[in-house]
A protein has these predicted regions:
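The feature captures the catalytic groove of carbohydrate-active enzymes
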Residues: 1-49, 53-117
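Non-catalytic C-terminal accessory modules of carbohydrate-active enzymes
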Residues: 46, 126-239
Length: 239
């Protein structure tokens, strides 16, 4: 059976809406800065500060837990920089603990793209790689075990017996794991303050689960390649 014994996680729309309100405002502030629109940058930066304060008041408990206490909640709060500095590490630990507890992803359309990024950024690479390599439902590799050659809309669009279940068989959403593969596994990341990958940082997150990783990103300034492999004496990284 593809069924999990997990009853389901629900992150309410008020939490998600506020998180994305903050993220949208953050992007506007960044765009204004890049375009040299100082008045707009200041306006959106001040709005972002107020949104963060309201978010923390409404959704962060006194002991640092989030309400709702779901993987998606922790992923969005950490990815969008919505938590006070002093509780971020603990929040990331709670996320990692939840992943370990259930052994699989419980995020939906909005939390899935960033969960492995957040885990890796806070030192929980083992949990991120665990999610990548899991072959039982729900996971990225379960579809491969039943012959998938595309990314599906739902984790179980085809059941183990080969019957069609639900959803599109060619859908972009879960392909978001590709960002983590490029930016954390291969380690190709844009430097802070840079635009269009003019300046880059190469910082792979190594694992004993892989013997090598290789990726190339074609930026407007030219191709950026990272290749690491395990050897008898350690690791080799070619950039």
């Amino acid at each position: 059976s593809t069924a999990s014994d997990y009853p389901g996680a629900f992150t309410d729309k008020e939490f998600v809406g506020t998180a994305y309100f903050a993220r949208s405002t953050q992007l506007l502030a960044q765009a204004a800065q890049i375009l040299g629109k100082e008045e707009d940058r200041k306006t959106y930066s001040e709005l972002l500060s107020r949104i963060k304060q309201s978010f923390q008041k409404e959704f962060v408990t006194r002991n640092g837990r989030l309400s709702p206490n779901t993987q998606t909640a922790y992923v969005l709060a950490l990815s969008f920089d919505l938590l006070p500095e002093d509780i971020r590490k603990d929040a990331a630990q709670r996320l990692a603990d939840d992943v370990r507890k259930f052994g699989h992803i419980t995020t939906g359309f909005l939390g899935t793209p960033e969960i492995c990024n957040v885990l890796s950024d806070y030192g929980h690479d083992d949990e991120a790689y665990m999610l990548l390599f899991r072959k039982k439902f729900p996971s990225w590799l379960y579809p491969v075990t039943v012959g998938a050659t595309t990314v599906w809309e739902s984790w179980d669009a085809i059941l183990p017996d080969g019957t069609f279940n639900k959803g599109s068989l060619n859908h972009f959403a879960y392909g978001a794991i590709g960002d983590w593969l490029f930016s954390r596994v291969a380690g190709i990341r844009q430097a802070e303050g840079s635009t269009a990958y003019k300046e880059i940082v190469i910082k792979p997150h190594f694992t004993t689960s892989l013997s090598f990783a290789r990726a190339t990103y074609y930026s407007m300034y030219g191709p950026i390649s990272s290749h690491w492999q395990r050897t008898d004496t350690g690791l080799e990284l070619h950039v």
